[in-house]
């Protein structure tokens, strides 16, 4: 069965509550994690289709969360969306190198965020990593 569960990784904020509400309204199940340790515990123990995270959010050994997920054989079908304030060309290149499947700059707005989430959730998951979807925006 195809999972419709999205893990939203960010500290509790009003924008996080708003994004969760918008995602749930669209029919997605949303799980939240306030930090990377909690996020990795959830991802390792649940069927998560998509992880939404800040591009440079670090895990315990100072490794990028997106890269950690992308390099795990058990999680290589889990998609990662970098939802970030960083919009430089080198940030996008970094996201592609570490295996982010999509990239949205926060100032693009929630509607664009939801479009990219829908695109990623509709695209069949493949076990390949180190790629980035065309679902990117400024």
Question: Where does each model-flagged region fall?
Answer:
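His-Asp phosphorelay/catalytic-motif detector in bacterial-type signaling
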Residues: 3, 47-49, 74-79
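Two-component/phosphorelay signaling modules centered on CheY-like receiver
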Residues: 13-31
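Acidic, metal-coordinating helix/loop segments flanking the phosphotransfer/catalytic sites
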Residues: 32-50
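Conserved phosphotransfer microenvironments
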Residues: 54-69
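Alpha4 helix (beta4-alpha4-beta5 surface) of REC/receiver domains from two-component response regulators
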Residues: 64, 86-104, 112-115
């Amino acid at each position: 069965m195809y999972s419709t569960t999205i893990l939203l990784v960010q500290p509790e904020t009003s924008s996080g509550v708003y994004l969760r509400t918008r995602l749930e309204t669209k029919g997605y199940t949303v799980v939240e994690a306030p930090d990377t340790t909690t996020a990795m515990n959830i991802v390792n123990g649940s069927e998560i289709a998509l992880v939404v995270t800040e591009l440079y959010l670090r895990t315990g050994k100072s490794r990028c969360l997106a890269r950690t997920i992308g390099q795990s054989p058990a999680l290589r079908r889990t998609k990662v969306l970098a939802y970030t304030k960083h919009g430089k060309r080198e940030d996008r290149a970094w996201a592609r190198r570490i295996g982010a499947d999509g990239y949205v700059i926060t100032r693009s707005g929630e509607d664009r965020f939801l479009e990219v989430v829908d695109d990623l959730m509709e695209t069949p998951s493949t076990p390949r990593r180190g790629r980035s979807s065309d679902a990117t925006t400024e």
